[in-house]
Amino acid sequence: MTVILPDFLKSNVLVVGDIMLDRYWYGSTNKISFESPVPVVEINNVIDIPGGAANVAMNIASLGGRVRLIGLVGVDDAAQRLKKRLTECKIKWNFISVDTHPTIMKLRVMSRNQQMIRLDFEKKFNNVNTDQLMNVIKVYLPQYKVLALSDYAKGTLDCVEEIIKIARFFKIPIIIDPKGVQFSKYKGATILTPNMSEFEAIVGFCSNEEIIIKRAKELMNEYDLLALLITRSDQGMTLLQRSLDPLYFSAQSKEVYDVTGAGDTVVGVLSAALSLGENLEKSCFLANAAAGSVVEKSGTSTVNVAEINNVVQKYEYTKIPTGIVDRGLLKYVVSVVRGRGEKIVMTNGVFDILHYGHISYLMDAKKLGHRLIVAVNSDKSTRRLKGKHRPINVLERRMFVLSALSMVDWVVSFDEDNPIQLILEISPDFLVKGGDYNVNNIVGGKEVLRQGGQVCVLKFQEDCSSSSIIDTMEINEIN
C-alpha cells in the first residue's frame, strides 16, 4: 500500500509565538588570532532566515499551505528583514512592534560546516502589554482550522491561558511546542510536543517505557490534554493519548546533520495535516517523516511535499509481522501501522469450518480499512458457546487456515466468552459482524463508538454457516 499525502495546498493554520531572526555568517577559517587563541573567521556570506514561530510558519508555507503569523518584534532592521522574507514566501503576518525591545536574533558563525559560536541578541518580552496582540488574535483566529503556538519562553505567550480559552471557544485545535517547567499554563490545549528532556523536566526521570506512559497519562489528565507527542531524537517520536495505547514512530533520518528548528518543522507539518482533517496518528507520522528530512540539512530549514513523500514511501515498505500473533505482538504491529495512518478493521468468531460465507464476509470487511484482524474463540471458549461437540477443528488449525487468506492481516485468539477486553486493547477503527446483529447488541460496539470508531453489520450468506454444514453432514450420515 502506498501512503497518500494530503493536499497541503488546502492547509490552513494560524501561528502565534516567539518570532526570531536566525542570522548565519559563513566564512573560512585558516588562522588563529594573535590577540587571543581563537580562530579567525573571514566572513564571505550572510544569510537571514525566519526562526522560532516564524520557522513554523515557513514550514507550512513550504508545503504550499495558507498560514498567518502573529507575534511581537522590535522596531529595527531585523523586523524589516523578517517582514520582507515572510512576504516573499506568501506568509501573512501581523507584527506588534515594541519600541522598548529588539527583535530577537540569534547569530551563528559558521565555518567548514561547523558552528563556531552563537550570539543571542534579545530582551524577553515579559511584562509587555499584550492587549494589542490579543485583539489581533481574536480577529483572525476564527478564519483558521488549527492554532499552532510556538513557545520559546521569550514572553510573547505570557498570555497563553487566554489564547487557549479563546481557541477552545471557537473549537479550534491547539498545538503547542512548550517551554519551561510550568505546563499548567497549557491546560486545555489539544496537543503538546515536548522533547524528552522537556518532558522529564516536568515529570521526573523516566527509566523505562512503562514509567513514561504512566506519567504522560497523569500529565494529560491533570492538564486536560488530548495528547502528548514526545520527540525523542534518535528514538523517533512517541504519541501518547489518554485512552489509547502509545504509538511509536521510528527516527527516519539516515544521518543527523543539524537539529536546529526540527521541533518547528514537527509543529508545522503536524498542524498543517490536522487542519486538513487527517487523524492524529497519520498527522504525527507525516510530522515524523518531515523531521527525518529536515535534520539532514544545515541550519534552520524547512521541508517540502516532495521531501516528505520521499521519506514516507521508503518508510512504508518497512516489513512488519503478519499472520498468527499473540496479543502483545498484535498491539505492537497495530501501533506501527496506525502510525502510518492506516485504518484497523476487526471482527471475531469461531470460524470452525471455513466456507464461502466466511470468505465473502471477510473480503467485504477488509474493504472498510487497510488492515483486518480476525479474533478467534479458543477451543474452551467455543465449547462454552457452541456445546461440548464443538469445535470440529482445533484452534491451531482454524487460525492457520485464516492466516492463509490474503485479506486477513492478523489472527489472534481469545479464551474469554467474548472479545471485549481484546477490542478495548486494540480500539479498532471499524468493528465488524456479519448477519442480523443490531449494532447496539454487538460486543464492544458501544466502546468502539465511544472511542470514535465505527460499528458495521455486513450481510452474511443465509445458506452458509458452520452449524448448517454440520447439520447437513449429520443428516446425510443418518440417511
UniProtKB/Swiss-Prot annotation:
GO terms for molecular function: ATP binding; heptose 7-phosphate kinase activity; heptose-1-phosphate adenylyltransferase activity; phosphotransferase activity, alcohol group as acceptor. One of its GO terms (biological process) is ADP-L-glycero-beta-D-manno-heptose biosynthetic process. This is Bifunctional protein HldE. It holds the Pfam family CTP_transf_like. Homodimer. The active site is at D264. It comes from Blochmanniella floridana. The gene is hldE. Residues 346-479 are annotated as: Cytidylyltransferase. In the N-terminal section; belongs to the carbohydrate kinase PfkB family. Catalyzes the ADP transfer from ATP to D-glycero-beta-D-manno-heptose 1-phosphate, yielding ADP-D-glycero-beta-D-manno-heptose. ATP binds at N195, M196, S197, E198.
